[in-house]
């Protein structure tokens, strides 16, 4: 995570012997030391992604990230995202990273106000690592969901002002007795509510309606990690085809979606070479160059 102003964080004295003890002038208050975001909220709120400045108003000048998709397959889950960020009707960036590995068995995709969403993902990764270091054990998947929901809820004030940032969480539940069904996808609303997806796929962002429609039609083809990754690429291609804020594969610049595969072996980023190959296959299969389209000329000698 990026620390714009590095300074020593003051921890309150939690000693039971004195209710008035202080550390660097900070009064003793109850605090969940295993929560990194809670520590920042109490000790250094200026380091949080959003501080609830009521003077801020929504504006198209703020970059927004767009479409994220996730699909379960037997033995795991895949998450993928496009690379475009927009400012109103302008393209702000063509190579934004929107899918982040947050620990060994989870990944987070971001959509919405880019600055807040990116800090969500980074802070969440620190949150999980901080808990594991203090407690000596990793959070359960349910615990990871609750931690992220709390962070999203903390951004409600900004969301009500128009600065919405919504994550999509994918992971592998180590406590599931059936490893083939241990893939998990969780979506969130702006108030911190969360939903465990049972249909096997989900999408967030401006192109989500088109991506979900694509996955609904193609999900029956998912049998393993390779087929799930292909369907994810196709869904993002369909979203980019109808949503101007979602970027499709850019063959000229060599920019392609990013993706993460999560299985019992852990989370790993999919190589750009692998995704580029799938993207080219999708484009080739959908090309009309060798088919009779509306502008194709009928063969000579045939009746019109």
Swiss-Prot record:
Keyword annotations for this protein? Autocatalytic cleavage, Cytoplasm, Hydrolase, Protease, Proteasome, Threonine protease, Zymogen
Q: Which organism is it from?
A: Mycobacterium sp. (strain KMS)
Q: What does this protein do?
A: Component of the proteasome core, a large protease complex with broad specificity involved in protein degradation.
On whether Transmembrane helix is a keyword of this UniProt record, the answer is no
- The highest taxon in the source lineage is Bacteria
Location comes to:
Cytoplasm
Which top class of enzyme applies to this chain?
A: hydrolase
| Binding partners and assembly | The 20S proteasome core is composed of 14 alpha and 14 beta subunits that assemble into four stacked heptameric rings, resulting in a barrel-shaped structure. The two inner rings, each composed of seven catalytic beta subunits, are sandwiched by two outer rings, each composed of seven alpha subunits. The catalytic chamber with the active sites is on the inside of the barrel. Has a gated structure, the ends of the cylinder being occluded by the N-termini of the alpha-subunits. Is capped by the proteasome-associated ATPase, ARC.
Q: In its UniProt entry, what is this protein called?
A: Proteasome subunit beta
Output the PANTHER family linked to this UniProt entry: ATP-DEPENDENT PROTEASE SUBUNIT HSLV (PTHR32194:SF0), METALLOPROTEASE TLDD (PTHR32194)
Propeptide residue intervals: 1-65
Q: Does the keyword Isomerase apply?
A: no
Pathway, per record:
Protein degradation; proteasomal Pup-dependent pathway
């Amino acid at each position: 995570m990026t620390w714009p102003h590095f300074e020593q964080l003051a921890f309150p004295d939690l000693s039971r012997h004195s209710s008035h003890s202080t550390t660097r002038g900070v009064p003793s208050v109850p605090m969940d030391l295993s929560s990194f975001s809670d520590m920042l909220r109490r000790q250094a709120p200026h380091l949080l992604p959003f501080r609830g400045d009521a003077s801020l108003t929504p504006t198209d000048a703020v970059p927004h990230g767009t479409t994220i998709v996730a699909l379960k397959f037997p033995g795991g889950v895949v998450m993928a995202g496009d690379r475009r960020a927009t400012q109103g009707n302008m393209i702000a960036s063509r190579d934004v990273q929107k899918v982040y590995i947050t620990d060994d068995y989870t990944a987070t995709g971001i959509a919405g106000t880019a600055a807040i969403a990116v800090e969500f993902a980074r802070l969440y990764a620190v949150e999980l690592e901080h808990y594991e270091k203090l407690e000596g054990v990793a959070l359960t998947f349910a615990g990871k969901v609750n931690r992220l929901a709390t962070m999203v809820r903390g951004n409600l004030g900004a969301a009500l002002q128009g600065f919405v940032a919504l994550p999509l969480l994918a992971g592998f539940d180590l406590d599931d007795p059936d490893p083939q069904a241990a893939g998990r996808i969780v979506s969130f609303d702006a108030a911190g509510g969360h939903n465990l997806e049972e249909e096997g796929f989900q999408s967030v962002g401006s192109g989500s309606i088109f991506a979900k429609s694509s996955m609904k039609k193609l999900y029956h083809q998912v049998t393993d990690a390779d087929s799930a990754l292909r369907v994810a690429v196709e869904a993002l291609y369909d979203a980019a085809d109808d949503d101007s804020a979602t970027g499709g594969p850019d063959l000229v610049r060599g920019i392609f979606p990013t993706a993460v595969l999560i299985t019992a072996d852990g989370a790993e980023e999919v190589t750009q070479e692998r995704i580029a190959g799938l993207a080219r296959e999708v484009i080739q299969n959908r090309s009309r160059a060798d088919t009779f389209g509306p502008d194709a000329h009928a063969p000579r000698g045939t009746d019109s």
